[in-house]
A protein has these predicted regions:
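Accessory nucleic acid-recognition modules appended to NTPase machines
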Residues: 1-167
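Conserved catalytic cores of phosphodiester-cleaving nucleases, focusing on short active-site segments
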Residues: 137, 166-176, 181-194, 204-206, ...
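Acidic/glycine-enriched edge-of-secondary-structure segments
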Residues: 153-162, 187-201
Length: 261
C-alpha cells in the first residue's frame, strides 16, 4: 500500500498489459471486480456488472485465455461452474487498492487498510486459503484419505428438507472406476479466520448423507476441516474419538506430502 514501493503499481501494470488493446476495457475491469467481490457465478457476475449473463461470455472467455480468471466446475452439479481470480495480487488490488486509489496515492495507507481488513480476509485470504487446501488434498499420500485422490474440487449440495445449500470447499474423489458408485474419499470445509466447531462437522456429515442418497459411495468418507485459525475443544475431542474426522491446520499444509506425516 506504500506508493513508494514497486509492488504498489504492479497489479495496475499487469492489468494494463492485458486490456490496453481491448475495446470496452471498463467492462473487463468490472468483471474482475465482480469476481473479487465474491460474485463467482456467471449470474452473480452479470448482476454485479449490470449486464445479461449471455452478454458477458466474451469478456469471461478473454480473461480465461489470459490465465487471470479460472473457471472451476461444480463437482456435484453438472453444467454449473464458478470463477476465481488466479493471481492473489490482482484480488488484493481489486478489493483493497483500487477502490481507494486516490487516498493511497495521498499517503493514507493506514486509513485505507483499517477500512479494508475485513474485506481482505473474506474476499482475498478466504478464497485463496480454499484453493491452497484443494491443492494440498490433491497431493496427499494414500493413507490420509484411504486412497490416492483422483479428482479434487468444490461444489454445492442442495438440502431441500432444510431449504438450504451446503458448500463443500474441498471434495476429494477416488480415481474413477469402470463400475459401481463414485466413491468420495473426503468432504471438507475450509475457514481462514474462524475457529471451527462441531457445527462444521455436522454440516459435512449432512452433506455425506445427502450425497449417499444421490448414489455416491460415502461409506468411508472422511470429514475434514481446514482452518487457518484453529479448532475448539469439542471438535478436537471428536476427532480424537473418530478416525474419520480430520483436522488440518495451517502448518499441516506446508508439511511434505510424501506420506511422512
Amino acid at each position: 500500500l506504500d506508493p513508494g514501493t514497486p509492488l504498489f503499481l504492479e497489479a495496475r501494470y499487469l492489468l494494463a498489459e492485458e486490456v490496453t488493446a481491448l475495446r470496452e476495457a471498463s467492462i473487463y475491469h468490472s468483471v474482475l471486480a465482480a469476481v473479487a467481490a465474491g460474485n463467482n457465478t456467471r449470474g452473480g457476475i452479470a448482476s454485479h456488472v449490470g449486464r445479461k449473463a449471455s452478454d458477458l461470455t466474451h469478456y469471461l472467455n478473454v480473461w480465461e485465455d489470459t490465465g487471470l480468471l479460472v473457471r472451476e466446475e461444480d463437482v456435484f452439479r453438472s453444467g454449473r461452474s464458478r470463477y476465481r481470480i488466479a493471481e492473489p495480487l490482482i484480488s488484493f488490488y481489486e478489493v483493497v487498492s483500487r477502490p481507494q486509489w486516490g487516498r493511497l496515492e495521498a499517503g493514507h495507507a493506514e486509513t485505507v487498510w483499517a477500512d479494508a481488513k475485513a474485506r481482505f480476509a473474506a474476499q482475498v485470504l478466504g478464497p485463496h486459503f480454499e484453493t491452497l487446501c484443494r491443492r494440498w488434498a490433491q497431493l496427499v499420500a494414500a493413507d490420509m484419505f484411504g486412497a490416492l485422490p483422483g479428482e479434487v474440487g468444490a461444489g454445492v449440495i442442495a438440502d431441500a428438507a432444510n431449504r438450504t445449500q451446503i458448500q463443500v470447499d474441498v471434495a476429494v474423489f477416488a480415481p474413477a472406476e469402470r463400475s459401481g458408485p463414485r466413491r468420495i474419499l473426503s468432504l471438507g470445509e475450509a475457514k481462514w479466520g474462524k475457529t471451527m466447531t462441531l457445527a462444521h462437522i455436522d454440516r459435512l456429515r449432512r452433506a455425506a448423507h445427502l450425497l449417499e442418497g444421490r448414489g455416491y459411495d460415502t461409506s468411508t468418507t472422511r470429514l475434514t476441516c481446514y482452518s487457518g485459525t484453529g479448532f475448539d475443544e469439542d471438535i478436537r475431542a471428536a476427532a480424537a474419538r473418530d478416525a474419520r474426522i480430520h483436522l488440518i491446520e495451517l502448518a499441516d499444509l506446508y508439511v511434505p506430502v510424501d506420506g511422512s506425516r
